[in-house]
A protein has these predicted regions:
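Short beta-strand segments
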Residues: 116, 182, 207-209
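N-terminal beta-alpha lobe that positions the nucleotide/phosphoryl donor
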Residues: 1-180, 187-189, 269-272, 280-286
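Conserved divalent-metal-coordinating catalytic cores
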Residues: 1-31, 37, 43-44, 50, ...
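A generic structural motif
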Residues: 182-184, 196-197
Length: 369
């Protein structure tokens, strides 16, 4: 069976079966980078589920009700919702379920997992899919792990993912999904590092938060930000965050909680640690022969790499990344809170004032010109 691969056994010809995210992690593991305990579900597992559950014909039916390019956004949203609902209604078939359960239990031995997408489409297009598919952290128990694998598979068919694939010219009907299963490393500090600042090639950017990286990635927790000189490997600036919250494991996954007072007054990293993370980014850049965006976490003073991907745009003039609009279809909770505050604190008072001013006008002296 070709449903699961371990990082150290991945070969170059496996790349289109596990996607670039998983393949990149396998290269890092083979080169001695410190990554969490990991397994990869290949696209063969996805296809086995889709075929056994009879979903392929249903997906084609939904996609061909009308020419995709002629669909309005709300029609695409309806189509995507129906397809994803099909994934969630269908159970993983017996042989595949037994195989996955046995492999996951024997390998991870009850550990909580992070379950991440790895879409082979990224290789075909040369475009970044970061943020367009689902990822889950701190998932425990065989049943819940299998449910979340289906959720990752289903996220291949979100409205944002469908629209984005159409925009960059991919054949939506041939899409498939691989999955990364990683032991959840409950880091005390986490973040991302850009080995090359997209807006200034002489700089490195580090963003860091207390707790799990999910808070930063989802936009729920404001990060501290460091700018470093690439050549001199020195810190140029540090912009502190307000440090009010962090994301931590919970019984049902993760949750945002108030940051303890003893942490709120100091940055997640010192200068020495920032330089160490800078070195990690340079190692990743040397391995992949391209500037990298690396997610990392620190647990018990050990630095782990969670994933690494190429930086797709290196200056405003080179911007080809078309994800922004599609990512905006799904706002984070913080985005929605900010929108609510803007409406309640700015827009409504302005509208009320305008209405009051109009009410005080003498309409008899108004002109229609």
């Amino acid at each position: 069976m070709n449903w699961i691969l371990s990082p150290l056994k991945v070969r170059p010809d496996h790349r289109n079966r596990i996607g670039p995210k998983a393949y990149g992690l396998s290269l890092m593991a083979q080169e001695g980078f410190n990554i969490p305990d990991t397994l990869f579900l290949t696209v063969d597992a996805y296809n086995a589920f889709v075929n056994a559950a009879g979903l392929r014909e249903r997906i084609l039916l939904e996609l061909n009700r009308k020419k995709f390019k002629d669909m309005r956004w709300e029609e695409i949203w309806d189509c995507a919702t129906r397809i994803r609902h099909l994934f969630l209604k269908k159970q993983i078939p017996g042989p595949l379920k037994s195989y996955l359960t046995d492999k996951i239990q024997s390998h991870f031995n009850g550990k909580t997992l992070a379950i991440r997408s790895s879409a082979p489409d990224e290789d075909a297009s040369g475009s970044s899919f970061a943020g367009l598919h689902e990822s889950f952290v701190n998932v425990r128990g065989s049943s819940s792990i299998l449910d979340h694998i289906r959720l990752v598979w289903a996220s291949l068919w979100s409205d944002a993912a469908l629209l984005y694939r159409q925009e960059i010219g991919l054949d939506v009907e041939k899409s498939a999904m691989a999955v990364v299963l990683q032991e959840t490393v409950t880091g005390s500090r986490s973040g991302v590092v850009f080995s090359q600042n997209p807006n200034d090639k002489t700089q490195v950017i580090i963003e860091s938060v207390y707790g799990l990286n999910q808070g930063l990635v989802d936009g729920m927790v404001e990060p501290d930000r460091w700018v470093l000189d690439r050549d001199k490997k020195t810190v140029l600036s540090h912009k502190p965050a307000q440090r009010e919250h962090w994301m931590i494991p919970s019984e049902h996954g993760v949750e945002t909680a108030p940051l303890p007072e003893d942490l709120s007054g100091r940055p997640p990293l010192n200068s020495k640690e920032a330089l160490g993370i800078c070195d990690l980014a340079f190692r990743a850049e040397a391995l992949f022969k391209a500037p990298q965006d690396v997610e990392w976490t620190i647990k018990n003073d050990t630095l782990y790499v969670l994933q690494s991907r190429p930086i797709t745009t290196l200056s405003p003039s080179e911007t080809q990344d078309k994800r922004a609009w599609y990512l905006s279809l799904h706002r984070s909770f913080k985005n929605l809170q900010d929108l609510r505050n803007t409406i309640e604190e700015t827009l409504i008072p302005e509208m009320t004032k305008t209405a009051k001013d109009l009410a005080e006008q003498d309409i008899m002296v108004l002109s229609d010109r």
